[in-house]
Amino acid sequence: MVLGRNHGTVMIAEESTAWPKVTGKAEDDGLGFSLKWNMGWMNDFLEYMKLDPYFRKFNHNKMTFSMTYAYSEKYVLVISHDEVVHLKKSMLEKMPGEPDDKFKNLKAAYTFMFCHPGKKLLFMGQEFGQLREWSEERELDWFLLGEEKHRDLKDFVQTLLKMYRKYPALYGTDTDPSGFEWINADDGDRSIYSFVRKSPTKRNNLLVVCNFTPVERPDYRVGVPKKKQYTLVLDENGQTAKKVFKAEKQDCDNRPFSFAYPLPAYGVAVFQY
């Protein structure tokens, strides 16, 4: 009724009991919500990101399990105020390591989040690395933007948002299983994930690589779907220099074509093809 009477309205459900068809149509015995919070993804994602990088290889499936049910509902990936209050720490402070490591971890985390199927919700202040937990009794710590690391994180999230809007591959097939393909979901030893997001037109698809360890991989080889040119459109520095890598005939990740890329510690790379 609400959706029918108010054009442009979005109704989002927070539900954690696995009740079926929350976003299904009412005429199909669904509840009729526009979107549902993906609580499973959120819990697994945050548990993984809080781990010391050494132990991530033993928890590799926490970042892949969500794809086994990603199309059962119309999901929104949520980092809400609930996750940055009551001694749970801010997103930046959840990350392991020294301050520089925390920022690098968070950039990798946000890249994975923005490239994973599902709409996005990131609570205010987490885009620039708020240190204190959120409180309704005070404003955000805007003074942190006077520090280079926090400005750099804000700029990186802004670049992610621009990339998200530019490429329909990141949103146009959120509810279509054919819009996602793992390249390598099983590289737990190196804690690297690689996958493809496909656009509705099958053009301007994106190849995504995320490294969740402080180990540099100077000759990281990634298998690719086709023998084409792959243009770098985002890296961990927020650079969009559009370097081009040409696939060659060399087996990798159970695919006949691949290319090598210098993947930094906590590095991310998004390629358009």
Segments from the language model and where they lie:
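Carbohydrate-interacting/catalytic domains
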Residues: 100-103, 114-122, 126-273
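Alpha-amylase-like alpha-glycosidases and glucanotransferases acting on alpha-linked glucans and related
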Residues: 1-120, 128, 135, 172-178, ...
